[in-house]
Regions:
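Small-residue-enriched hydrophobic alpha-helices in membranes
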Residues: 1-7, 13-192
């Protein structure tokens, strides 16, 4: 909750759209809403201290073999933070710096961070190669394999099976749409 609130404040102000996005990403049982609101309101006062929250979260969820693999809670949380950052229709340099620092703390690989940014940042169609995490010079079969791996990892049914809240599954659906659109653009562009 605190990290999401600090993300919303990263550009200097918390908008209604960001609060709505926060509620879509983080499922809070009705019995905990008052306490969660207090934590959110305290945390959104200032961005300072976000690194400590990120470190604690990373320590709780990082697995030894893959600090932020495709099935990682940390990756799901990063996707949620991107969603909050882009909720107001603008993506500010301060938000980018915040997310980049959190990604480093989470152990997120740079290419995966770029793919997430390409999927979420508003303003023009994302680079389809960045969305799929492949080099533009890769052959079509390599691109297809990357697309299939992303679809498998992102499929909403798989997310539900992992116990991800339904609200977060909406993010997976948007992510899957971006992945499929990237594959379609590449395939069409190459005449396949």
């Amino acid at each position: 909750i605190a990290l999401g609130a600090k993300m919303a404040k990263a550009d200097g102000r918390v908008t209604r759209d960001e609060v709505t996005a926060f509620r879509e990403v983080f499922h809070i049982p009705p019995s905990d809403e008052r306490a969660a609101a207090r934590v959110f309101n305290l945390a959104r006062e200032d961005v300072a201290g976000f690194e400590d929250y990120a470190k604690r979260i990373a320590a709780m969820f990082r697995s030894n073999d893959k600090p932020c693999g495709q099935d990682s809670v940390l990756c799901d949380l990063m996707e949620g933070l991107f969603y909050i950052a882009a909720a107001d229709g603008a993506y500010h340099p301060e938000e980018d710096a915040f997310l980049e620092r959190v990604a480093v703390i989470f152990g997120l690989d740079g290419a995966l961070f770029e793919r997430m940014r390409a999927r979420h940042v508003p303003g023009g169609p994302p680079d389809p190669y960045a969305v799929l995490g492949v080099d533009p010079r890769a052959d079509l079969e390599t691109v297809r394999q990357a697309w299939r791996a992303e679809v498998r990892a992102t499929h909403p049914d798989r997310m539900l099976a992992r116990g991800i809240p339904e609200e977060a599954v909406k993010l997976a659906e948007a992510r899957l749409s971006a992945i499929n659109a990237a594959w379609d653009r590449i395939r069409t562009g190459r005449g396949a």
